[in-house]
Amino acid sequence: MANLKDIRDRIVSVKNTRKITEAMRLVAAAKVRRAQEQVLRSRPFADRLARVLENIQSRMSFEMADAPLLKTSDLKTITLLAVTGDRGLCGGYNSNIIKRTEQRYAELNGQGYKVDLVLIGRKAITYFSNRSSQYTIRATFTGLEQVPTSDDAESITTEVLAEFLSQSTDRIEVIYTKFINLVSCNPVVQTLLPLDPQGIAEADDEIFRLTTKDSRLTVEKGVGPANEQPPLPSDIIFEQSPEQLLNALLPLYLQNQMLRALQESAASELASRMTAMNNASDNAKALAKTLTLDYNKARQAAITQEILEVVGGSCS
């Protein structure tokens, strides 16, 4: 049986580790709430912008405006924009996005398309840079805010927009983690460019609020505020032509879509980290309990051995 001192030292180490993981869980829980609040605050603007675009598009002719961001061409080159985090300790969050990116890359390559990568987050950059002979990396972004801002989205949008308008790529797809709840986050693929003005509002959008119940963190599911927005008046008069307005508003809508993908990813990363740290805390607690039992058994065996030696010595 292991030495008593070794077991005791390991118990202390496990308990200290549990304190760290518990602290990280609480920090992630607080940040998840902030990330979700940011998403909620941005939704009214996103909904209004989508409604304005729908209104403008309904006034356009069937020939469609000469909007560069709406143009579709023969697909030759496709750019995949993968969103991961800069740090680990968040379960399968980063690895799931990397796997989905590899799958999509293989699918498009198999169909004969040239595929480029734009990578967001140190984890994706490190992984694909180590395999640079297999993948073409067009741009990388790191050091984004933990709670994404419009500046983060603008810097990325500017890069991909320049690629698309210069016809260096014919389509841009973003691969990010859609936040569902604290224990379920799914990697999704969404076409970012060319934009489609049809059906731009997401009807299945839901809100998940982080609350406490019976002293435990839980999630309440609610209905998104989009339905609460009053409809746009039908008699709005625009000074510019629908084509001019569309060309001016589509870049803003593109940036808003990018910001939403970053926000969803940030919330998913924090939720995954909170879940991972919660599991680590539970495992540390169970391990400490097992080690304590081993320590007590070893201590009891040592005491029994000493008694037997004393009794044996007195008999002799």
Curated annotation (Swiss-Prot):
Q: Where in the cell is it found?
A: Cellular thylakoid membrane
The record's section on Pfam families has:
ATP-synt
Q: Which GO terms describe its molecular function?
A: ATP binding; proton-transporting ATP synthase activity, rotational mechanism
Which InterPro entries does the entry link to? ATP_synth_F1_ATPase_gsu, ATP_synth_F1_gsu
Topology in the lipid bilayer is annotated as: Peripheral membrane protein
> Record's SUPFAM superfamilies?
ATP synthase (F1-ATPase), gamma subunit
Per the UniProt record, which residue ranges are transmembrane? none
Q: Which Gene Ontology cellular-component terms appear in the entry?
A: plasma membrane-derived thylakoid membrane; proton-transporting ATP synthase complex
Question: Which keywords label this protein?
Answer: ATP synthesis, CF(1), Hydrogen ion transport, Ion transport, Membrane, Thylakoid, Transport
Instruction: Outline what the protein does.
Output: Produces ATP from ADP in the presence of a proton gradient across the membrane. The gamma chain is believed to be important in regulating ATPase activity and the flow of protons through the CF(0) complex.
PANTHER family annotated for this entry? ATP SYNTHASE GAMMA CHAIN, ATP SYNTHASE GAMMA CHAIN, CHLOROPLASTIC
UniProt subunit comment:
F-type ATPases have 2 components, CF(1) - the catalytic core - and CF(0) - the membrane proton channel. CF(1) has five subunits: alpha(3), beta(3), gamma(1), delta(1), epsilon(1). CF(0) has three main subunits: a, b and c.
Family classification: Belongs to the ATPase gamma chain family.
NCBIfam families with a match to the protein in the record:
ATPsyn_F1gamma, PRK05621.1-2
- What's the protein name? ATP synthase gamma chain
Q: Which organism is it from?
A: Prochlorococcus marinus (strain MIT 9303)
Give the lineage: Bacteria, Bacillati, Cyanobacteriota, Cyanophyceae, Synechococcales
